[in-house]
């Protein structure tokens, strides 16, 4: 999902861990294989929604997972092999920073988006990015207010602080919290309750199919 400079001025990054290790808190409701399928489907729906945002110059997925890489490439995203060592103490932020170095070569404005937003609407992300333009660094908290759905950096480094209590960590790092409603953008899925909330909003077709085939 790379365009010309006229297509947009933002590089979007999505980091995806190995599918087999992802979303283990969904284990009570899905078999291991179905869980992997659901995680992949959520990525597909997230990418599909993001692709409609006109301000994006590129979409890059960084992942060590071959299936996730293939799905992202099939949707036109740029794919980076995640170089993060297995024993890295902070693998998500390490992966994001690695992607940032590459993406920053073509875009001075960078947005990190979670890849588990099956109810995301294109307009929500577009509106959040428009709001982010008023700040050097900003973020959108998840629906519970503790995590981070989006981190934006305009003309400056990301300094990602994803992980437990990332909303507070991003706030303490100087990022401005964006306060728009954007329910689909805020609804990342880690638990069965999160999935129920996303389904109530309306998930994308890939996730709907994956969830139906338990």
Swiss-Prot record:
GO terms for molecular function: GTP binding; phospholactate guanylyltransferase activity. It catalyses: phosphoenolpyruvate + GTP + H(+) = enolpyruvoyl-2-diphospho-5'-guanosine + diphosphate. It comes from the Bacteria. Phosphoenolpyruvate binds at residues 148, 163, 166. Its EC number is 2.7.7.105. Keywords: GTP-binding, Nucleotide-binding, Nucleotidyltransferase, Transferase. Pathway: Cofactor biosynthesis; coenzyme F420 biosynthesis. SUPFAM superfamilies: Nucleotide-diphospho-sugar transferases. The keyword Nucleotide-binding applies. GO terms for biological process: F420-0 metabolic process. Guanylyltransferase that catalyzes the activation of phosphoenolpyruvate (PEP) as enolpyruvoyl-2-diphospho-5'-guanosine, via the condensation of PEP with GTP. It is involved in the biosynthesis of coenzyme F420, a hydride carrier cofactor. HAMAP family: CofC. Belongs to the CofC family. This is Phosphoenolpyruvate guanylyltransferase. The gene is fbiD.
């Amino acid at each position: 999902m790379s365009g010309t400079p006229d297509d947009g001025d933002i590089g979007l990054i999505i980091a995806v861990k190995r599918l087999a290790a992802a979303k283990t808190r969904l284990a009570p409701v899905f078999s291991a294989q179905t869980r992997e399928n659901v995680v992949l489907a959520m990525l597909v729906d997230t990418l599909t929604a993001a692709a409609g945002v006109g301000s994006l110059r590129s979409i890059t997925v960084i992942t060590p997972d071959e299936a996730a890489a293939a799905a992202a490439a099939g949707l036109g995203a740029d794919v980076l092999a995640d170089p993060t060592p297995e024993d890295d103490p902070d693998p998500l932020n390490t992966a994001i920073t690695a992607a940032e170095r590459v993406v920053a070569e073509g875009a001075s404005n960078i947005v990190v988006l979670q890849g588990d937003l099956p109810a995301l609407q294109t307009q929500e992300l577009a509106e959040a990015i428009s709001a982010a333009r008023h700040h050097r660094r900003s973020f959108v908290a998840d629906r519970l207010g503790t995590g981070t759905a989006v981190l934006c950096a305009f003309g400056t480094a990301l300094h990602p602080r994803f992980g437990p209590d990332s909303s507070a960590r991003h706030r303490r790092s100087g990022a401005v919290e964006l306060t728009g409603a954007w329910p689909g953008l805020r609804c990342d899925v880690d638990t069965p309750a999160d999935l129920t909330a996303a389904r109530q909003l309306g998930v994308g077709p890939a996730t709907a199919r994956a969830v139906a085939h338990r």
